[in-house]
A protein has these predicted regions:
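Short glycine-rich anion-binding loops that position phosphate/pyrophosphate groups of nucleotides
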Residues: 44-47, 117-121
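Anionic-ligand binding region
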Residues: 94-103
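A cross-family acyltransferase "interaction/gating" segment
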Residues: 74-77, 98, 107-113, 122-181
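Catalytic core of membrane glycerolipid acyltransferases/transacylases, capturing the structured
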Residues: 1-6, 10, 17-20, 34-92
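Residue-level preference for the first positions of well-ordered beta-strands
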Residues: 37-39, 111-115
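A short beta-turn/loop motif at secondary-structure boundaries
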Residues: 29-34, 162-163
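Thr-Gly-centered strand-to-loop micro-motif
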Residues: 27, 64-66, 88-89, 116, ...
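Generic preference for hydrophobic
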Residues: 26, 40, 63, 170-172
Length: 181
């Protein structure tokens, strides 16, 4: 199953982006490989983010998503293959419990991609960050790696299934150690 997830993340993302006419301009790609496992933090703009992350991170990672996506016909099967952790955002206590397997996955060597805002931002401005991603990184003793994406929301609007051709600018920033936090 992990091999299938790795192939789907890398080749599937590459093919999907190419077929849609989306090109990535990546700065700092070496930072995606500098320290693994890691908690990759990205600004969430649209469903296109999933494909961009797959093309950048390529293998041995999973994600965290809202519970409502577990049975989504487009995202659900991908999430199942990738062992995505689904979080009930309406119940903080349950959400914390649901994050424990994510910490275990980090300790076992698998990276996590998560939007620290907890939702899509309707504009290019960042929303306030949730604490969960940082707690997971600290508990697992792994670094956080910020990934900044630009143009995803313009190329594929929120709640849309239409992808327009274009260029997504991606900056993978250096890993930030959580030791001593």
């Amino acid at each position: 199953r992990r091999l299938g997830a790795n192939v789907a993340a890398s080749a599937g993302s590459d093919l999907g982006l190419a077929a849609a006419g989306v090109r990535l301009d990546i700065v700092g790609e070496e930072n995606a490989w500098a320290e693994r496992p890691a908690v990759f933090l990205f600004n969430h703009q649209s469903q296109l983010d999933v494909f961009v992350l797959g093309a950048v991170l390529r293998k041995d990672f999973t994600g965290v998503a809202k519970k409502e996506l577990e049975y989504n016909p487009m995202f659900g099967p991908i999430g199942y293959l990738a062992d995505v952790a689904y979080i009930d955002r309406s119940n903080n206590a349950r959400a914390r419990e649901e994050l424990q397997p994510v910490v275990d996955a980090l300790k076992a060597g698998r990276s996590i991609a998560i939007a620290p805002e907890g939702t899509r931002s309707p504009t290019a401005r960042l929303l306030p960050f949730k604490k969960g991603p940082f707690h997971m990184a600290m508990q697992a003793g792994v670094p956080v790696v910020p990934i900044v994406m630009r143009n995803c929301g313009e190329i594929m609007a929120a709640h849309s299934y239409v992808i327009h051709p274009g260029v997504v600018d991606v900056a993978v920033l250096p890993p930030v150690s959580t030791k001593g936090w």
